[in-house]
C-alpha cells in the first residue's frame, strides 16, 4: 500500500520550478551536426558498409544519403578521401576513375546535393597513393600537390565547399612529429 501511495503521489505531483527550468545534464548534450564520408572504405570486416556488398560509387545512393543526412540536421560533411590506390572518386585527369565513366562521380553527386541542401563540405585532398601516404617520398609529395591543384580547379568555387582536409594524419604523442609539420608546411 505504501508503494502504491508513493507512486500515485509521484505521478500526480507537479514538477518544481527547478525541475521545469534547469536541466544541467541535458543542456550539455549537443547534437551531432557533421559526419565523415568515406568513399574508399577499406575495412572488409564490416559486412554492412563494405563496398563489396553494394555499389559505393552510385551517384543516386550518395545523393539520397546526403538528403537523409540533411533531414537529420547534419550540416557539415568531411570527405575522408577522394582517391585511393591510384583511383579517383571524382573526374580526375591524373588517375583512373573508381566509378563508371558514363555516370556522375560520387564526389560530384555529394557536392551538388550538399549545395542544394545548403550543407558545408570539407574536401579531402588525398590520397595521393593510399591511406599510408608518406609525404617525405618526393613522388607522393608531388602527386599530392598535383591532386590539390586539380581539386582546387574542379571544386574551389563550388557552393558547397567550406574547407579542405589533408587526410595524412600523424600522432599527437604529445606533439606532432617534426616530419609531419615539415610535410604539411611544404604543401
Could you say what each language-model-derived stretch is?
Residues 1-8:
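Bacterial N-terminal signal peptides
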Residues 19-187:
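Glycan-processing catalytic domains of CAZymes
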Amino acid at each position: 500500500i505504501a508503494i502504491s501511495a508513493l507512486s500515485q503521489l509521484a505521478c500526480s505531483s507537479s514538477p518544481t520550478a527547478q525541475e521545469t527550468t534547469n536541466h544541467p545534464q541535458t543542456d550539455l548534450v549537443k547534437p551531432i551536426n557533421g559526419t565523415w564520408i568515406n568513399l574508399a572504405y577499406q575495412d572488409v570486416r564490416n559486412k554492412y558498409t563494405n563496398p563489396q556488398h553494394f555499389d559505393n560509387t552510385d551517384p543516386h545512393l550518395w545523393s539520397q544519403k546526403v538528403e537523409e543526412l540533411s533531414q537529420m540536421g547534419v550540416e557539415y560533411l568531411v570527405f575522408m578521401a577522394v582517391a585511393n590506390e591510384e583511383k579517383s572518386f571524382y573526374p580526375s585527369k591524373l588517375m583512373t576513375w573508381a566509378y563508371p565513366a558514363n555516370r556522375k562521380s560520387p564526389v560530384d553527386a555529394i557536392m551538388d546535393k550538399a549545395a542544394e541542401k545548403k550543407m558545408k563540405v570539407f574536401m579531402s585532398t588525398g590520397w595521393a597513393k593510399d591511406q599510408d601516404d608518406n609525404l617525405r617520398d618526393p613522388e607522393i609529395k608531388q602527386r599530392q600537390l598535383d591532386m590539390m591543384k586539380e581539386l582546387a580547379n574542379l571544386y574551389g568555387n563550388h557552393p558547397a565547399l567550406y574547407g579542405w582536409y589533408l587526410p595524412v594524419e600523424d600522432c599527437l604523442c604529445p606533439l606532432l612529429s617534426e616530419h609531419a609539420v615539415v610535410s604539411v608546411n611544404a604543401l
